[in-house]
């Protein structure tokens, strides 16, 4: 079966009354990732990047451009990556997840870039990939890292609409 991914994204709605739902979805994913890592020192960091420009009255206007969510959870190992790359994945269904929340990211933001440092087969690895409505998941790369690198995942929501 062929699929028009942009059409699939367009089927989802982001109510105007809940504009922070994509951020909430990303934070829930981070919380679950920390739970899956079974660590007691879980950490989530949220960074808001703003565009700064002067308006006509010499006052700074700052619109949100990007939001970055960083956590030290389990990361995008093969199992989690394959779940992310599968629309309506049942991987986390026991946690009440439907496998479609990331579509909200693309309703509110132009694209998403992900960098995840995780452990697989007793080796530290870094997986990077892009996610957007035109190409779905693309440009995925994995490389091995030295063991002293900290395990972190950075989800960057780019270009607030």
Language-model-detected regions and their locations in the chain:
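Bergerat-fold GHKL ATPase/HATPase_c domain
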Residues: 1-54, 60-62, 79-85
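Beta-strand secondary-structure signal
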Residues: 45-47, 66-68, 113, 154-156
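Short amphipathic beta-strand and strand-loop transition segments with alternating hydrophobic
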Residues: 47-58, 137-147
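Short beta-strand element(s) in the Bergerat
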Residues: 56, 61-67, 153
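Acidic ATP/Mg2+-coordinating residue in the GHKL
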Residues: 71
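A short glycine-centered beta->alpha linker in the GHKL/HATPase_c
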Residues: 75-77
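GHKL-type ATPase core
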Residues: 92-161
């Amino acid at each position: 079966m062929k699929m028009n991914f942009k059409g699939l994204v367009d089927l989802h709605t982001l109510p105007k009354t809940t504009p922070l739902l994509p951020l909430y979805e990303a934070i829930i994913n981070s919380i679950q990732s920390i739970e899956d890592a079974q660590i007691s020192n879980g950490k989530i960091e949220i960074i808001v990047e703003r565009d700064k420009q002067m308006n006509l009255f010499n006052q700074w206007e700052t619109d949100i451009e990007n939001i970055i969510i960083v956590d030290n959870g389990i990361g995008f190992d093969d199992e989690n990556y394959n779940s992310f790359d599968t629309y309506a994945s049942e991987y986390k269904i026991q946690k009440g997840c439907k496998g479609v929340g990331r579509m909200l990211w693309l309703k509110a933001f132009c694209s998403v870039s992900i960098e995840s440092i995780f452990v697989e087969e007793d080796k530290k690895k870094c997986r990077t990939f892009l996610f957007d409505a035109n190409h779905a998941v693309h440009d995925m790369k994995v490389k091995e890292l030295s063991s002293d690198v900290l395990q972190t995942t950075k989800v960057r929501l780019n270009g607030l609409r």
